[in-house]
Amino acid sequence: AAPLGVKSLVVDSAADACAGQVAPLVVADWTDYAALEKFAAQVDVVTFDFENVPAETAHWLAERVAVFPAPQALAVAQDRLAEKTLFRECGLSTPDFMTVDTREQLDQALARVGAPAILKTRRLGYDGKGQFRLRAVADADAAWAALGAQAPAHGLILEAFVPFERELSVLAVRGRDGDFRTWPLTRNWHVDGVLSM
């Protein structure tokens, strides 16, 4: 933002947040509404750079200042089930998937989705975290042992495994005036399911 002449102010709960190296940093918890009130009074627009900002906080901020993307988009991005459901509603292809809340539902999901498959937490998983790869149906006990305890808090989803050659990312933005822009595709390199570059 700085090279574009845009002044930034950053909120993070960590005093050593990396964004604090390039912009003034407000150290506050996402539910510290007194600090967030002061933050909102100093900015024209709020955005976020990862999806684990509580959606409730984004909604709260949106009542005080413009928030982009919209808090509703953040809420969808935080839940793999909501994402996949939205994609299908938009006519996009997704791997087969099924929610899993109990060990018995994992067996049912495997019967429907098949193996290989990936059991994932619906929330807060990234870079291979919150995931277990089932190479065969016989891996169900190990998968449940690894992630089952997270089912009550985060929910789980079983997704059919998709063999792929590479993962690509694109940065796309839409301005308030409707102008839509993209930047060139970049390739993501993974090692053991974790983004390394």
Q: Where are the regions a protein language model picked out?
A:
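ATP-binding N-terminal substructure of ATP-dependent carboxylate-amine bond-forming enzymes
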Residues: 1-85, 89, 104
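Active-site nucleotide/adenylate-binding loops and adjacent lid/helix of ATP-dependent enzymes
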Residues: 76-169, 173-197
